[in-house]
From Swiss-Prot:
Keywords: Ribonucleoprotein, Ribosomal protein. The gene is rpmC. PROSITE patterns: RIBOSOMAL_L29. It comes from Carboxydothermus hydrogenoformans (strain ATCC BAA-161 / DSM 6008 / Z-2901). This is Large ribosomal subunit protein uL29. Belongs to the universal ribosomal protein uL29 family.
Length: 69
């Protein structure tokens, strides 16, 4: 998912997206360990999506802190 699409989501939706991505990563790692993973590059994609979501969440936290000061 692109960062532009993620920025359009609300904070609650981002938290939900983060949870679903972490769950997907867990399942992919499990499939990798059992030798059932069809697309190993998907792990990399999911890890990067998790990083994107975390970055956007952090950007919003920093923006809120600046407004409060």
């Amino acid at each position: 998912m692109k960062a532009k699409e993620l920025r359009e989501l609300t904070d609650a939706e981002l938290v939900e997206k983060l949870a679903s991505l972490k769950d997907e990563l867990f399942k992919l790692r499990f499939q990798l360990s059992t030798g059932q993973l069809d697309n190993p590059s998907r792990i990399r994609e999911v890890r990067r999506d998790i990083a994107r979501v975390n970055t956007i969440i952090r950007e919003r936290e920093i923006a809120r802190q600046k407004v409060e000061k």
